[in-house]
Swiss-Prot record:
Residues 101-123 have a biased composition (Basic residues). Keywords: Ribonucleoprotein, Ribosomal protein, RNA-binding, rRNA-binding, tRNA-binding. This is Small ribosomal subunit protein uS13. GO terms for biological process: translation. It comes from Fervidobacterium nodosum (strain ATCC 35602 / DSM 5306 / Rt17-B1). It comes from the Bacteria. GO terms for molecular function: rRNA binding; structural constituent of ribosome; tRNA binding. Part of the 30S ribosomal subunit. Forms a loose heterodimer with protein S19. Forms two bridges to the 50S subunit in the 70S ribosome.
């Protein structure tokens, strides 16, 4: 297994698929990384040389925020919304859908499980 930006990526997968194991890199960015570093995207990770792996790792570190850095930035952005008290921040605080979805009949994932009802004895 190759290690890129502190994450072990599977060695038996193709490069453009294996790069998606990094938080913040999807299909488009993975192909872009392969193109800019000159690595064949259909090559298996175990077939890569150390030079190619280091080239990919340095390109990612120079051009993208990934893993912990990206996670902290996203958390910081959400915290900022909550601190300024805007509508989106309030929805985050209350644990409700943020992007305008209906909540009367759906949104169970965001709201969590329904509170249990107490059953009366004797009925």
């Amino acid at each position: 297994m190759a290690r890129i930006v502190g994450v072990e990526i599977p060695s038996n997968k193709k490069v453009h698929i294996a790069l998606r194991y990094l938080y913040g890199i999807g299909p488009t960015r993975a192909m872009e990384i392969c193109k800019n570093t000159g690595v064949d995207p259909d090559k298996r990770v175990k077939e890569l040389t150390e030079d190619e792996i280091s080239k990919i790792a340095s390109f990612i570190q120079q051009n993208y925020k990934v893993e912990g850095e990206l996670r902290t930035e996203v958390m910081r952005n959400i915290k900022r919304l909550m601190d300024i008290g805007c509508y989106r921040g309030l929805r985050h605080k209350l644990g409700l859908p943020v992007r305008g979805q209906r909540t009367r009949s759906n949104a169970r994932t965001r709201k969590g499980p329904r509170p249990s009802r107490i059953k009366k004895k004797g009925k």
